[in-house]
C-alpha cells in the first residue's frame, strides 16, 4: 500500500500519544426549561477547545462507542476570508505546528501543514469508532488525494467503502471559465465484510414512492414490476406457463424464467405476477411498496435529494437571524449520513462542529423517528458558544423563520470547556481536576472501558472486569500505603487484584500469595 510522505510526518505520526489528557469541565446545561448551571444528565455535548485535546479527553467514556463520525475539516483552499480559516494558517494551528514540528515547520507548504494537522486527529477518531462504526469525511479536490492516502493508512484500505460525490451547487458559476459544482465525502467502515452492520438502506422519498402504482387494485397496495426472465439457458427454468387469459407461453428467445417452476407457482397463487392489462403478456414480478425496507445508497447525491450550499446558508441565516457562516453544510445532507450510519440510540460525533449542522440534524432525526441518538460536537473557534451552541439552543426550543414559527425539536445538551491537564509536567497528578476524574482516567487506562457507576462498600474500588478487581487507593493530602490494614477493607472476591497506592508495605511473596499487582502512584499511571 502506498505511504504518503510529507515534511513533518515523523513528528506527528505518533503525536496523538503525546497529547496531554485534559478533563472536560461542564459550564452549563440546556433543555426545554432553558439554560442552567445544574447538570441535566444530558449525553449530548458541545465542547469548546482544540479538537485534538478534546478527542483525547473523550477516550475514557467513548473509545469504541461512536457509531457515526462526520467531519468537515478545512479544505485548505488558501482562502483566509472565511469565518473558519481554510488555509490552516489560523494562529492556534500555527502555534501548534511550531511546538510539535519544530524548526521544520517554517518550511512547510500548506499541504504539509494540513497533513500535520489532520493525521493525529484521524488517529484519535479511529480509536473512538465502534466495531460497527462508520466515518464520513467531507473534502474537495485540494486535499482529496492526500486524505484518501492517510485514511487508507489509518483506517485500512480494506475498510474504504465509497467516495460520495455531492452536487453542492444548483447552477454553474458564470463568472468562471470552469465552475466546480461538487465535493466529496469519503466513507470508511470498521466492518466492511458485513456492511449491513455499518450502512443502512435509506428511506424512499416522494419521488421514489410515486413510482409505485396499483392498476389492478391489488389488496397488498401499490407496486412496481420487474422482469421475471433472466439471460441464459437453464433447463429447469425453461418450462411453459399458462397466462390468466389462457395463452400458453415459454420464456422469450435467448432467455429463461427467473425462478424455478415451484417459485413461479407460489408467486402466481399469491398474486405477485402481472401479465399485463389483458392477462396474456409475459409475466413480471410485483415488488410492493409496503414491503420495501429502503433503497440502496448511490454514490451520486444530487442537490435535489440532500440540499446545496445556498440552501444551507439561507437555513442558518434564518435560524440565527444573521449571516454567520459562508459555507455551512445543509441539514438534509447530514440527515442522509445519519440515516445511513446510525440506529435510533447511536452516538454521532463531529469534531469540526462549525455552525452545528450535525447536532441540528441529529435532533431533527430524533424528532422524526422517536430516536434517542446522542451528538458530540467539538469546535475550537471562539464562536462555539455564539454560533454552534446558539444554533442548537434555538433548534431545541423553536424559532421564527420570517413569519413562520418553527417547532422546537426538544432535547438537551451540556456545554463543556477543556479543563486542566490530569498529569502535570512533573508527572505528578493534578489534584485540581478532582478525584472522580482521576479515578475515571485510571480505570480507562487499565480496561479501555468507561468507569461503571455501581455502588460499593469500598470507596477505593474502581470496579471488576474479567475476574480482576481494580483499586485506586489515593488521597490528595496524605500518603497511602498498601498494607494488611488496607487488605482488611477489601470485600470484593476476585482471582486477581490490581491496587494503586503511594507505597507498598507488602513483600513480593505476599503480593504473589494474594494475587495482587501493586502499582505506584503516580509512576505507574499510564499516559494516554
Task: Enumerate the language-model features and the residues they cover.
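Accessory, often C-terminal, charged low-complexity segments
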Residues: 1-38, 43-44, 52, 58-67, ...
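Short amphipathic alpha-helical segments at helix-loop
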Residues: 39, 106, 110, 318-322
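Catalytic cores of nucleotide-enabled group-transfer and carboxylate-activating enzymes in metabolic
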Residues: 40, 75, 88, 99-101, ...
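Cofactor-binding loops of NAD(P)H-dependent oxidoreductases
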Residues: 49
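Conserved proline-anchored active-site loop of SAM-dependent methyltransferases
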Residues: 64-82, 151, 348-363
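Aromatic- and acidic-residue-enriched carbohydrate-binding clefts of CAZyme catalytic domains
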Residues: 84-109
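Active-site-adjacent bridging/hinge elements
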Residues: 92-100, 304-313, 362
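Class I SAM-dependent transferase core
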Residues: 306-328
Amino acid at each position: 500500500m502506498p505511504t504518503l510522505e510529507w515534511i513533518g510526518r515523523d513528528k506527528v505520526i505518533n503525536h496523538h500519544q503525546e497529547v496531554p489528557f485534559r478533563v472536560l469541565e461542564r459550564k452549563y446545561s440546556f433543555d426545554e426549561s432553558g439554560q442552567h448551571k445544574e447538570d441535566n444528565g444530558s449525553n449530548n455535548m458541545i465542547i469548546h477547545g482544540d479538537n485534538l485535546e478534546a478527542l483525547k479527553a473523550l477516550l475514557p467514556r467513548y473509545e469504541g462507542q461512536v457509531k457515526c463520525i462526520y467531519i468537515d475539516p478545512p479544505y485548505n483552499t488558501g482562502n483566509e476570508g472565511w469565518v473558519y480559516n481554510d488555509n490552516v494558517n489560523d494562529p492556534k494551528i500555527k502555534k501548534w505546528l511550531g511546538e510539535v514540528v519544530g524548526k521544520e515547520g517554517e518550511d512547510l507548504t500548506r499541504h504539509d501543514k494540513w497533513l500535520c494537522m489532520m493525521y493525529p486527529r484521524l488517529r484519535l477518531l479511529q480509536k473512538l469508532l465502534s466495531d460497527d462504526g462508520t466515518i464520513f469525511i467531507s473534502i474537495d479536490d485540494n486535499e482529496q488525494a492526500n486524505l484518501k492516502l492517510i485514511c487508507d493508512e489509518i483506517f485500512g484500505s480494506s475498510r474504504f467503502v465509497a467516495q460520495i460525490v455531492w452536487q453542492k451547487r444548483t447552477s454553474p458559476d458564470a463568472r468562471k471559465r470552469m465552475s466546480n459544482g461538487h465535493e466529496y465525502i469519503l466513507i470508511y467502515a470498521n466492518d466492511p465484510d458485513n456492511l449491513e452492520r455499518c450502512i443502512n438502506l435509506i428511506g424512499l422519498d416522494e419521488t421514489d414512492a410515486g413510482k409505485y402504482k396499483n392498476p389492478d387494485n391489488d389488496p397488498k397496495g401499490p407496486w412496481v414490476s420487474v422482469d421475471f426472465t433472466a439471460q441464459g439457458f437453464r433447463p429447469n427454468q425453461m418450462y411453459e406457463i399458462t397466462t390468466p387469459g389462457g395463452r400458453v407461453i415459454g420464456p422469450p428467445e435467448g432467455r429463461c424464467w427467473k425462478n424455478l417452476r415451484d417459485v413461479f407457482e407460489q408467486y402466481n397463487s399469491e398474486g405477485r405476477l402481472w401479465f399485463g392489462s389483458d392477462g396474456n403478456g409475459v409475466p413480471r414480478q410485483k415488488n410492493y411498496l409496503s414491503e420495501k425496507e429502503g433503497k440502496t445508497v448511490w454514490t451520486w447525491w444530487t442537490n435535489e435529494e440532500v440540499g446545496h450550499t445556498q440552501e444551507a446558508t439561507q437555513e442558518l441565516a434564518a435560524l440565527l437571524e444573521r449571516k454567520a457562516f459562508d459555507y455551512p453544510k445543509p441539514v438534509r445532507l447530514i440527515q442522509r449520513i445519519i440515516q445511513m450510519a446510525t440506529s435510533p440510540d447511536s452516538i454521532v460525533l463531529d469534531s469540526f462542529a462549525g455552525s452545528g449542522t450535525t447536532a441540528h440534524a441529529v435532533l431533527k432525526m430524533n424528532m422524526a423517528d422517536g430516536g434517542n441518538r446522542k451528538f458530540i460536537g467539538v469546535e475550537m473557534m471562539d464562536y462555539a458558544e455564539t454560533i454552534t451552541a446558539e444554533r442548537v439552543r434555538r433548534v431545541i426550543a423553536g424559532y421564527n423563520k420570517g413569519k413562520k414559527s418553527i417547532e422546537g425539536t426538544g432535547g438537551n445538551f451540556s456545554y463543556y470547556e477543556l479543563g486542566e491537564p490530569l498529569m502535570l509536567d512533573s508527572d505528578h497528578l493534578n489534584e485540581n481536576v478532582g478525584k472522580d476524574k482521576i479515578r475515571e482516567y485510571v480505570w480507562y487506562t487499565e480496561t479501555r472501558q468507561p468507569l461503571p457507576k455501581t455502588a460499593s462498600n469500598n470507596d477505593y474500588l474502581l470496579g471488576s472486569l474479567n475476574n480482576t478487581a481494580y483499586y485506586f487507593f489515593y488521597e490528595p493530602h496524605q500518603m497511602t500505603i498498601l498494607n494488611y490494614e488496607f487488605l482488611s477493607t477489601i470485600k470484593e472476591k476476585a482471582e486477581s487484584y490490581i491496587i494503586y497506592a503511594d507505597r507498598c508495605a507488602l513483600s513480593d511473596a505476599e503480593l504473589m500469595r494474594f494475587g495482587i499487582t501493586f502499582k505506584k502512584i503516580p509512576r505507574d499511571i499510564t499516559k494516554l
